[in-house]
Amino acid sequence: MTNMSNAISLDLGDDGILVATMDLPGKPMNVVNGDLMRPFADMVERLATDASIKGLVLTSGKADFCAGGDLDNISRIATAHQAFTVAEQLKAVLRRMETLGKPVVAAINGHALGGGLEISLACHARIVIDDPRLKLGQPEVKLGLLPGGGGTVRLPRLV
């Protein structure tokens, strides 16, 4: 098992399937911030360059898959240019993962909201636990924010 800065652990099986478990330290839920997305981008790069990896299963070590954007980080964005840069970086890593040519499956074990849902939408398939309390959604629209990772394109394509 490989640990990517404690936020994502990787386990490559004998079958060539890489299991990536998001488990952001110090947070009750995984949130989309630099501490998660830097190792996420490194994981996507490894998926792209390591021929022994045949596919990826992405899941969470927490009770929920991912709660979306880190509101503390979002509140520190001071300019439109900064907001644009953050959104473009997220879109770029998700688009890279989506177009690699290797299958990526999100194993959604709890709520996937906002950026967490966008991560799962960039996967080729999603498997969701059967729990009537589980929520998938983009609640940022209620705050006047647009989904920044490409979810406005991917979600309608799936529905």
Residue ranges and their predicted role:
Residues 1-59, 77, 92-96:
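Conserved CoA-thioester-binding segment of acyl-CoA-metabolizing enzymes
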Residues 20, 39-40, 58, 70, ...:
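Terminal peptide-recognition signature
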Residues 60-93, 112, 142-144:
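Glycine- (often His-adjacent) and acidic-residue-rich active-site loop
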Residues 61, 96-143, 147:
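Glycine-rich beta-to-alpha active-site loop
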Residues 152-159:
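Hydrophobic, secondary-structure "cap" segments at the distal end of domains
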